[in-house]
């Protein structure tokens, strides 16, 4: 059991026997009313999204999900097939099931993912917090524009755009924080 004030992104709740993922949680306390938690939830079985408000002391059922290591095996249209690294079982997910990690998924990636299961059914995939990706296009840095932290847009192999430091060049590998889509530095790859 969790209370409303303990909710945070990544928490999974059981509401009407379905697992709901907390995607965003914002704690609000006003002088007149009691504290509340505004949340954005996603149903892991249907993909339906909603916004809900909970009181700080509301009791909520949390769910413990099973997790297994997996790798991306192949992509076929909007279908993504992952393979369990221990018993080589194949699992398939649609693009809408993994919309949060979609910008980082690309054919041939070697990252170990976490396959997330609810009652034996694969419902989502989570990536490591730091991944390495190759920059395929970026502009040259503007000369003399060096006061402070200077960033510029860069395009990755799968088409995702990210803000990188001005010294990053085309074909370099960079580390990305998947929690907030931020540039961490050059990769050691």
From Swiss-Prot:
Pathway: Protein biosynthesis; polypeptide chain elongation. One of its GO terms (molecular function) is translation elongation factor activity. It is found in: Cytoplasm. GO terms for biological process: peptide biosynthetic process. InterPro entries: Elong-fact-P_C (IPR015365), NA-bd_OB-fold (IPR012340), Rib_uL2_dom2 (IPR014722), Transl_elong_fac_P/YeiP (IPR020599), Transl_elong_KOW-like (IPR013185), Transl_elong_P/YeiP_cen (IPR001059), Transl_elongation_fac_P (IPR011768), Translation_prot_SH3-like_sf (IPR008991). GO terms for cellular component: cytoplasm. SUPFAM superfamilies: Nucleic acid-binding proteins, Translation proteins SH3-like domain. Keywords: Cytoplasm, Elongation factor, Protein biosynthesis. SMART domains: EFP (SM01185), Elong-fact-P_C (SM00841). The lineage of its organism: Bacteria, Pseudomonadati, Pseudomonadota, Gammaproteobacteria, Pseudomonadales. It comes from Pseudomonas putida (strain GB-1). CDD domains: S1_EF-P_repeat_1, S1_EF-P_repeat_2. Belongs to the elongation factor P family. This is Elongation factor P. Involved in peptide bond synthesis. Stimulates efficient translation and peptide-bond synthesis on native or reconstituted 70S ribosomes in vitro. Probably functions indirectly by altering the affinity of the ribosome for aminoacyl-tRNA, thus increasing their reactivity as acceptors for peptidyl transferase. It holds the Pfam family EFP_N.
């Amino acid at each position: 059991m969790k209370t409303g004030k303990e909710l945070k992104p990544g928490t999974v709740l059981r509401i009407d026997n379905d697992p709901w993922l907390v995607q965003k949680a914002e704690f609000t306390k006003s002088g007149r009313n009691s504290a509340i938690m505004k949340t954005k939830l996603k149903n892991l079985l249907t993909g339906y999204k909603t916004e809900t408000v909970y009181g700080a002391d509301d009791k909520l059922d949390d769910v413990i999900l099973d997790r297994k290591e997996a790798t991306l095996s192949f992509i076929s249209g909007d279908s993504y097939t992952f393979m369990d690294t221990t018993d080589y079982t194949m699992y398939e997910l649609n693009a809408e099931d993994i919309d949060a990690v979609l910008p980082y998924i690309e054919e041939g990636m070697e990252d170990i993912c976490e396959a997330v299961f609810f009652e034996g059914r694969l419902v989502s995939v989570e990536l490591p917090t730091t991944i390495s990706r190759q920059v395929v296009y970026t502009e040259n840095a503007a000369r003399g524009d060096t006061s402070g932290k200077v960033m510029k847009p860069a395009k990755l192999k799968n088409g995702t755009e990210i803000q990188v430091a001005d010294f990053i060049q085309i074909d370099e590998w960079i580390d990305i924080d998947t929690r907030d889509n931020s540039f961490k530095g050059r990769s050691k790859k």
